[in-house]
């Protein structure tokens, strides 16, 4: 226990605490900014929540006509887009029984097609299994409700990536800095080497994961309570449009009770993986590069690979699939495992059990024995690759340029900010006509040539006289 206390004290250095506090404050600031920023459809997250608050007093029979009436009387493009989105979500909730019927009908169609073709393969098994799973949801009645507060907690991509950065910083302080200062050399002479120390570091990482999760997502929960409509924890999970296709018969409260343990487990796996990288590599530049490349590759596999691709296992056997935990509950996907439909949630669970066991074992046992290179003594002379102290001048210069002045950390933060901040021009429109005008002008943008004149004349033939006059004057 004393070793654990010492590790916690060594982790809470001034530099580490300041960086973690900065990230902790940055998360809600960017979240509030995003909530009040007009998106590409012309409305803010606050407008979306406000519209749900306005229609919450209407009955199930009156809510769709009310939204349709608001859409017809709206003049601004953003208001029209907002009403269209809310109408689509409300219609989906009110027609949930039809959605369940369509799942069963699709299963029957696939079964009939496979019987005629004589192929009782994966498609038929998958359809039958999907139908059985969704049949348990019969009788579920989703409510038309504002899900912004819940999604701000469970599907906030910015918070997920801030948590990943915080885990990396903690792993770096737990493992790499002591190792780089050669403070662990004497432990190799003890009976248990560094195994007990690394086990304590692993325990501290688990504690840090739980604390980070409670702080980051707890702050998001406070923001949701202050700025969004209240969340009805007794409503079915399918009331949230993003979880409309969920196969789980859970209330929102039960969903949250399952969500956070899965999130914590996924973060533990990622933290252990960062610790393993720090234990295996001796150069801080290699640690940064290896960690960044790993996260980028995982994110690319998760976001770009289709669920129907033969590489789908790379999408679902993926740390980012667990970090973005909501997908484990919102989708029901089976992949072809030797002709048998295996659910991706089960697959990820098996993947987690194997990987976290391997990472904990590797972290606690790596470098338990001496790994220094030895000289090979031959008659008359000694030959060895590491006969003396050797430093790569290139890596030394990289270290001087990036690490002492925190330049590398600043560059990483700047890169994340650039990715988050879309530099593209954000346009807002007051009417649908302005959208048409903008598309028209973009289409014929450029010097006025004979070919452009010909295209303009052809397009004006199909336009009425008032509209033609408006375009010419515009």
Where are these regions (language model features)?
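Extracytoplasmic loops/domains of multi-pass membrane proteins
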Residues: 66-110
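Residue-level recognition of pore/gate-forming positions within transmembrane alpha-helices
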Residues: 24-28, 204-205, 292-296, 414-418
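Secretory targeting signals
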Residues: 23-69, 107-110, 114, 122-178, ...
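Residue-level detector of conserved catalytic or cofactor/ligand-binding positions
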Residues: 461-474
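Helix-loop-helix units of permease transmembrane domains in multi-pass membrane transporters
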Residues: 3-7, 12, 172-210, 393-397, ...
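Terminal transmembrane helical anchor/hairpin motif
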Residues: 38-43, 147, 230-254, 285-380, ...
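Membrane-helix interface segments
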Residues: 16, 193-194, 283-288
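Aromatic- and glycine-rich beta-strand/loop motifs that create alpha-glucan
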Residues: 1-20, 373-411
């Amino acid at each position: 226990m004393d070793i654990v206390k010492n590790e916690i004290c060594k982790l809470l250095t001034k530099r580490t605490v300041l960086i973690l506090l900065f990230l902790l404050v940055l998360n809600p600031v960017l979240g509030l900014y995003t909530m009040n920023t007009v998106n590409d459809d012309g409305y803010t997250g606050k407008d979306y929540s406000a519209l749900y608050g306005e229609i919450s007093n209407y009955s199930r029979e009156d809510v769709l006509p009310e939204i349709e009436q608001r859409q017809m009387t709206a003049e601004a493009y953003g208001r029209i887009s907002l009403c269209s989105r809310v109408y689509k979500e409300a219609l989906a909730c009110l027609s949930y029984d039809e959605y369940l019927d369509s799942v069963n009908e699709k299963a029957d169609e696939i079964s009939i097609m496979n019987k005629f073709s004589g192929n009782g393969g994966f498609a038929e098994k998958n359809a039958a299994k999907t139908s059985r799973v969704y049949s348990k949801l019969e009788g579920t009645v989703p409510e038309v409700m504002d899900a912004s507060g819940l999604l701000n907690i469970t599907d906030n991509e910015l918070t997920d990536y801030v948590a990943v950065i915080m885990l990396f910083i903690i792993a770096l302080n737990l493992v790499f800095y002591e190792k780089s200062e050669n403070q662990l050399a004497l432990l190799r002479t003890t009976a248990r080497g560094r195994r007990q120390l690394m086990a304590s570091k692993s325990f501290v990482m688990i504690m840090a994961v739980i604390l980070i999760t409670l702080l980051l997502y707890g702050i998001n929960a406070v923001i949701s309570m202050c700025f969004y409509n209240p969340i009805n924890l007794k409503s079915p999970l399918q009331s949230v449009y993003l979880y409309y296709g969920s196969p789980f018969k859970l209330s929102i409260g039960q969903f949250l009770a399952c969500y956070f343990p899965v999130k914590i487990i996924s973060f533990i796996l990622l933290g252990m993986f960062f610790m393993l990288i720090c234990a295996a590599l001796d150069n801080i530049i290699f640690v940064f590069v290896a960690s960044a490349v790993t996260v980028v590759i995982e994110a690319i596999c998760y976001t770009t690979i289709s669920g129907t691709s033969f590489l789908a296992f790379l999408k679902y056997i993926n740390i980012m699939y667990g970090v973005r935990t909501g997908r484990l509950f919102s989708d029901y996907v089976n992949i072809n495992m030797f002709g048998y439909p295996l659910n991706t949630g089960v697959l990820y669970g098996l993947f987690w059990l194997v990987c976290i066991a391997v990472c904990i074992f590797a972290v606690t046992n790596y470098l338990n024995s001496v790994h220094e290179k030895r000289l090979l003594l031959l008659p008359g002379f000694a030959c060895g690759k590491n006969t003396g102290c050797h430093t790569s001048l290139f890596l030394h210069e990289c270290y001087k340029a990036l690490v002492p002045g925190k330049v590398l950390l600043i560059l990483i933060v700047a890169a994340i900010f650039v990715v988050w901040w879309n530099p593209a021009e954000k346009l807002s429109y007051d009417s649908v006509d302005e959208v048409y005008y903008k598309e028209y002008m973009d289409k014929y943008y450029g010097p006025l040539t004979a070919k452009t004149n010909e295209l303009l004349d052809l397009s004006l033939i199909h336009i009425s006289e008032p509209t033609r006059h408006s375009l010419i004057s515009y």
